[in-house]
Amino acid sequence: MVCLPCIFLPIMMAIYMKFIMPYVYRFLPERWVHFLDPILYPTCPMKIPEQEKKEEEEEKEKSCCSTEAENTTEVTTETKKDQ
């Protein structure tokens, strides 16, 4: 058998966070909200370095594709002249 606080506390917390907290945040000073947000909604402080890798890959693709694109345009212009 589950104790009653184990059932009611999560339900009450969900109701508070969903319906009551947005109204409370409207009346709090913004400085308090910025102080409380990291405590109430913690996030991982580790930064993911994927952005740098993606930018490097895009630069490599651009350099590869730019030479290929020039070659294809030359070929298409030659074929148009031949026709």
Curated annotation (Swiss-Prot):
It comes from the Eukaryota. Residues 67-76 have a biased composition (Low complexity). Transmembrane segments: none annotated. Residues 51-83 are annotated as: Disordered. InterPro entries: UPF0729_C18orf32-like. PANTHER family: UPF0729 PROTEIN C18ORF32. Belongs to the UPF0729 family. This is UPF0729 protein CBG02799. It comes from Caenorhabditis briggsae.
